[in-house]
């Protein structure tokens, strides 16, 4: 049986909560805006080494910091430095977590040995930004429950939700525990994130993964980011949306395992 330990650690910017399992080379997991750290649970048993799932700012027991991806990255980097002393782990993020991972590679390169960016980009194009303003308004007026239907249609494809109503129920239960303030602050951070001028500085080898049905961070965003990064490759997963590790755990692991092994 896999043993999972839940912990928290104090950093100069605040407290960070996380869980870990396994031994060996460290792999840090950063969840998306629309999920929590448990969003990687379906694939953790098949991931190599020591796997560390981190709560992003305002999620779990992690303290909220200023609403910028750079500040999010600085908080998580401080935790990683303590959790993985003397090591530059692979950092894998999904959605919000992928932007934080990219921010770590830019601002704290000594703490990132490799990157797996699942649903990411350098910035959001103007047509995509009203979605964040809409989600902010929904949460501020109706709470997390008001944004849950929107979130579900971004996490999964419509066809998958139609065939797996139990997944919608489970995700809805998870999202009900999301702090509305944390959600809104994360949306504000994503509204203004822009790594187009700094992404070229990333020296870590990078795998960019995107579902071809991802409405939150479409394949065009992944390809635009790939054009900026010096050591990256893009993998497009068919018939998957924003959280492929939830929708097709085995297919997701198949897509990333060689990269994680260093190939």
Task: State the predicted function of each range.
Residues 41-45, 52-92, 254:
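Active-site loop/oxyanion-hole signature of alpha/beta-hydrolase fold enzymes
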Residues 240-253:
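Catalytic histidine-centered segment of alpha/beta-hydrolase-like enzymes
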Residues 14-63:
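Conserved HGGG/HGGXW glycine-rich cap/lid loop of the alpha/beta-hydrolase fold
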């Amino acid at each position: 049986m896999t043993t999972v330990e839940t912990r928290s650690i104090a950093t100069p910017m605040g407290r960070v909560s996380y869980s870990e399992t396994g031994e060996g080379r460290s792999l840090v997991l950063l969840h998306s805006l629309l999920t929590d750290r448990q969003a990687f649970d379906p694939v953790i048993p098949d991931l190599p080494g020591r796997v560390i799932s981190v709560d992003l700012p305002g999620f779990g027991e992690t303290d909220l910091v200023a609403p910028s991806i750079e500040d999010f990255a600085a908080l998580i980097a401080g935790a990683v430095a303590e959790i993985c002393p003397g090591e530059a782990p692979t950092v894998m993020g999904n959605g919000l977590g992928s932007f934080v991972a990219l921010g770590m590679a830019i601002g704290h390169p000594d703490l990132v040995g490799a990157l797996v960016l699942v649903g990411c980009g350098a910035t959001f194009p103007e047509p995509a930004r009203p979605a964040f303003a809409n989600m902010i308004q929904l949460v501020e007026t109706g709470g997390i429950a008001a944004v849950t239907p929107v979130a579900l249609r971004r996490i999964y494809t419509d066809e998958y939700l139609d065939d797996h109503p139990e997944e919608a129920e489970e995700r809805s239960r998870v999202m009900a525990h999301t702090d509305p303030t944390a959600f809104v602050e994360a949306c504000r951070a994503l509204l203004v994130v822009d790594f187009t001028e700094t992404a070229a500085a990333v020296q870590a080898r990078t795998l960019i993964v995107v579902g071809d049905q991802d409405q939150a961070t479409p394949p065009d965003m992944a390809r635009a980011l790939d054009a900026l990064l010096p050591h990256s490759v893009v993998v497009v997963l068919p018939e998957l949306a924003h959280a492929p590790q939830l929708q097709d755990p085995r297919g997701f692991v198949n897509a990333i395992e060689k990269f994680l092994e260093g190939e």
